[in-house]
Amino acid sequence: MESGCGLGTLCLLLCLGPVVGFGVDPSLQIDVLSELGLPGYAAGVRQVPGLHNGSKAFLFPDTSRSVKASPETAEIFFQKLRNKYEFTILVTLKQAHLNSGVIFSIHHLDHRYLELESSGHRNEIRLHYRTGSHRSHTEVFPYILADDKWHRLSLAISASHLILHVDCNKIYERVVEKPFMDLPVGTTFWLGQRNNAHGYFKGIMQDVQLLVMPQGFISQCPDLNRTCPTCNDFHGLVQKIMELQDILAKTSAKLSQAEQRMNKLDQCYCERTCTMKGMTYREFESWTDGCKNCTCMNGTVQCEALICSLSDCPPNSALSYVDGKCCKECQSVCIFEGRTYFEGQRETVYSSSGDCVLFECKDHKMQRIPKDSCATLNCPESQQIPLSHSCCKICKGHDFCTEGHNCMEHSVCRNLDDRAVCSCRDGFRALREDNAYCEDVDECAEGQHYCRENTMCVNTPGSFMCICKTGYIRIDDYSCTEHDECVTNQHNCDENALCFNTVGGHNCVCKLGYTGNGTVCKAFCKDGCRNGGACIASNVCACPQGFTGPSCETDIDECSDGFVQCDSRANCINLPGWYHCECRDGYHDNGMFSPSGESCEDIDECATGRHSCANDTVCFNLDGGYDCRCPHGKNCTGDCIHEDKIKHNGQIWVLENDRCSVCSCQSGYVMCRRMVCDCENPTVDLFCCPECDPRLSSQCLHQSGELSYNSGDSWIQNCQQCRCLQGEVDCWPLPCPEVDCEFSVLPENECCPRCVTDPCQADTIRNDITKTCLDETNVVRFTGSSWIKHGTECTLCQCKNGHVCCSVDPQCLQEL
């Protein structure tokens, strides 16, 4: 439970004062009837006279209707309510006798975030809501609201503090677990019903309002006292302190980490660099790599194609490629016998006598140079080849490439008879005419691939790949055929579905006895599963603990079947789906609440005044009871005293405030019991036993919509006992034994909490804000606060009434 205002009454004692003429800021007010646009909005709801003439009133009759806010209107409501913990529900109503209906409901899927209900069957007002621990909770207020009379009702919620007023009288004030108002998208708002099929309110409603402000009941009853500050104010102050503590702890941790990093940074200078082909480049440094301009940016090499500029060359020069460079540059030239030669280029000329003369281009002139001595060739003369740039011959097959070449990446050197040339590798094209630089050919984009149907072409350096489309498998490098996912078990069908192969995919169909879309199939039970049971296979129900039968329709009586052995001072009480050991009359629990009743101890009725002995007798305490003893020599009447009134011995009467309970006086003892409903008795009181009314034969539809119940039938659903009466479903929380302890836990799949001694195991704690914890960094934490343990990322710690409880989140560890 969230921390209340210290003790439950602390908020009331801080500041009291009358407030007169209380005004309401329109931005904090939701006038539900006006916003919904009744009566034209919903068929079957009509305007009628109300308690007063200041606003419209509407009759909600016993007919099918759908009074639901549009998504746009609902979102206007929720924008004011979302994540608010200080608001008041106001309504003026006149509810039909015995009707059990919902005044309004805010719910999403199966979760009721806020719902106000009035039960005429059990004479209760119920508030259903979601808690901060994401559990459903119902707060029950015994009160007769469905009496066909006008009432003004207000329910003020301030964090964990509830105040219920009826007709400007404070009826109840409680400290409860704080509601969770983080309303998700898709939440719906209903008025006068829970949904299209359940919770129909029958009667008249007027002045239905939601005020997002503290103590909004003042607008309905201006003469009431107002508390200051409210519990929500108090919660806010505590929360702010917790947040500041958490910020302080996180800031301290960050400063410590920053200091450690600064100490390391002082010892070195770090600069991002890039590495390419064994060379290291500094940040923002640029260089040329073949026919690409590259730059080091943030430690990554970024390159783009080099664009060569065609400039005019001066006289006696021309453009020519230079080794190691992509673009042509101006080079000196020589003109010799009508041909152009570049600087350093050689040419042979043979005289008429057959002598070889060697010329070389130098300083714009072809100059004769001495010829080199020629090596002796080891091949026949027929295999000897003359060269244009040397007076020496070579043998056929000479390897010019080993003597050096200018072929770059993606280009290979190839030998001809008299020289070496460059050639682009397969899958690459030349960037210039000498093939020294080459680029990849995108066969996919240019349509130069052989990929067939059912494939996708993917370009690779120097080649391409044919990838099979989804649902197909490979035949060869270029072809794919249909893939039968059903045969290879590569489908997403549910285990309870049949797989049917299709072209390029497959279909899933649920097996007989299951329903769903094929990827998700749920078992179907034709008779349904009652009392919270789950259908796990075709017509097979898995029953919750405490129930049995094909449809979980039978409650297991643990008390009569001998499963339970209660202490001699306790009785075994069988309840739908479970049991508990309850102290016998004359005993009460000592506060330990042991499961078997060992903590029951005797009540001294005589000392506490909880006896019914008349004045002419003497009360004598017994183990588990008392005795009204007549003093020696006196003639005692055997009368009883009940609610300060004398009841004669043998007298039977009906309680004034409960016509369905009968009491009797027997020799000084008063015994009361609930009236037994015998529907065979023609004089049965139909007020107390409405299930015996033959006129009320309407059936009820189960909440799941799969089952129908007759009037008078009962069942269990989500830890609530439900009953069908007059065609209406009325549900109330299962009775739980009192748990008056500091720490309690609600076990999984159970409906009632149990006491535990270890606060770290508890999910509900009576928080005491005076008890604090000291975390690992010596920061003081308030009870209820939580934090991530210093030096970890996945260890969450909480302060629970002075105890530090830490646990590791496995999902967090997986995400690291």
Swiss-Prot record:
Domain EGF-like: 397-439, 440-481, 482-522, 523-553, 555-601, 602-637
Organism per entry: Gallus gallus
Molecular function terms, GO-annotated: calcium ion binding; heparin binding; identical protein binding; protein kinase C binding
Residue ranges constituting the VWFC domain according to the UniProt record: 272-331, 638-693, 698-756
Cysteine disulfide links: C401-C413, C407-C422, C424-C438, C444-C457, C451-C466, C468-C480, C486-C499, C493-C508, C510-C521, C525-C535, C529-C541, C543-C552, C559-C572, C566-C581, C583-C600, C606-C619, C613-C628, C630-C636
GO cellular component annotations of the record: cytoplasm; extracellular space
Name of protein: Protein NEL
Presence of the UniProt keyword Calcium in the record: yes
Tissues in which the UniProt entry reports expression: Strongly expressed in early embryonic neural tissues (brain, spinal cord, dorsal root ganglia); less in other tissues such as cells around cartilage, myocardium, lung mesenchymal cells, and liver. After hatching expression is restricted to neural tissues including retina.
Stored CDD domains: EGF_CA (cd00054), LamG (cd00110)
Keyword Protease: no
One biological process term in Gene Ontology: commissural neuron axon guidance
Annotated Laminin G-like domain residues: 65-228
Entries under PROSITE patterns matching the protein: ASX_HYDROXYL, EGF_1, EGF_2, EGF_3, EGF_CA, VWFC_1, VWFC_2
Glycosylation positions in this chain: N53, N225, N293, N298, N517, N615, N635
